[in-house]
From Swiss-Prot:
GO terms for biological process: peptide transport. GO terms for molecular function: peptide transmembrane transporter activity. SUPFAM superfamilies: Periplasmic binding protein-like II (SSF53850). The lineage of its organism: Bacteria, Pseudomonadati, Pseudomonadota, Gammaproteobacteria, Enterobacterales. It comes from the Bacteria. Signal peptide: none annotated. InterPro entries: SBP_5 (IPR039424), SBP_5_dom (IPR000914), SgrR_HTH_N (IPR025370). Disulfide bonds: none annotated. It comes from Escherichia coli (strain K12). This is Uncharacterized protein YbaE.
Amino acid sequence: MRLLNRLNQYQRLWQPSAGKPQTVTVSELAERCFCSERHVRTLLRQAQEAGWLEWQAQSGRGKRGQLRFLVTPESLRNAMMEQALETGKQQDVLELAQLAPGELRTLLQPFMGGQWQNDTPTLRIPYYRPLEPLQPGFLPGRAEQHLAGQIFSGLTRFDNNTQRPIGDLAHHWETSTDGLRWDFYLRSTLHWHNGDAVKASHLHQRLLMLLQLPALDQLFISVKRIEVTHPQCLTFFLHRPDYWLAHRLASYCSHLAHPQFPLIGTGPFRLTQFTAELVRLESHDYYHLRHPLLKAVEYWITPPLFEKDLGTSCRHPVQITIGKPEELQRVSQVSSGISLGFCYLTLRKSPRLSLWQARKVISIIHQSGLLQTLEVGENLITASHALLPGWTIPHWQVPDEVKLPKTLTLVYHLPIELHTMAERLQATLAAEGCELTIIFHNAKNWDDTTLQAHADLMMGDRLIGEAPEYTLEQWLRCDPLWPHVFDAPAYAHLQSTLDAVQIMPDEENRFNALKAVFSQLMTDATLTPLFNYHYRISAPPGVNGVRLTPRGWFEFTEAWLPAPSQ
């Protein structure tokens, strides 16, 4: 903030003459700078010593001196920003860049993307919103979920290629023949980000803390107890077999922070700064797996860069756009794909909404062209034809005599594309004689709300990261949505069905059984996917190793920058 104040004071001196020499009194300068005459003399002396201006004072009170400017405020701002970056004061850079959006883009562009700063490879990512605090357990946003995966590790992790769980903090695990005991053998060289050695007791304590969270308690409902059975072994004892257990432990929600310090983990990057304007990660020198090739990653929270009239959509998960303005055409898409995650509609059958009426709503959505004509941005979404590849949406020939109810209520939460979807659905159902009342829950999930209790229809977003089949099982088991979709007996039956699926040791059998559960939900017109997202990552030449992850981000440990040319 001190740099910004000095720059503002310099601009106040400069502005009356637009940089031309001035003949002025100290009193006038003090009034202009909103300070005392003594203080303005100090400002003039410091600015002259820094080479910004020349001040020739005249002796005697009220005498006019000569003020000549040597640098423009713009060049001074750029020099200050360069100096702040070289000294690791990124916060000062963002404060100095408080300009109108168009100027902000021009000013920040040279600092974005891949940079070698003091011989340190650093990647700076402009981001369109502040990141929410990292809390234990489930997190609502993709950015936060991805960030948690960079800072924290779990006993297991998902393999990037197979999407199956493999060792992480535990190098191996063994399961008893009855599936009721799981031994996880810990690596012997684990360290927390603060340099402390990781002990089995640390992990045990953090696991017990996670199980105090209602959603995690539901996720690990089959766990009877967890014990440290050896200084290098954690053992899970189960009520019933759960062959998703290694998957559950690999999920970001089960990653383990230090029991005393919730933002200290063991992941490839440690968190060194977390503010509303800047998030900085630095590589963990004692990481137990392959070390990152980048030394630092920074999120610069700059919403004005993403104003629609500047041609940059904030809906893209990551958009790395760097270089000078004349180099922007060199930025190209380096990775893209269709999300496995989807926006969905659930329908609660009741005396107000019958099975065939619910099927008619779904048929209207998928067969009327509604999804294909949503005005949500070019190439942003694609209409869903399946829940997952091969889990296709059923189609029905709805009898003509089936009429929709006179009124229905829809509750939905973010993302913003569902605003458009809700309005289009309202207009489409009105043409069928059904008045749709719309209620918006301004959040990314169904936590902390009971609005669903009054809804016939509910829309939301189901993020899918790694292991999509397991992620959908976790969704049915833990999301607070489902107790509002089903009555109590039906919800209890769903949970007992999931219990029956999890005891199957064979993965293919488990997948097929889970597919049958979701196929029945779609056949019963309880659930239908609406659309998937196009994920894109754009980067300039020189930012290498950028690979799209299932969450629409890229793996920070794989990205790298070539050494700068001499």
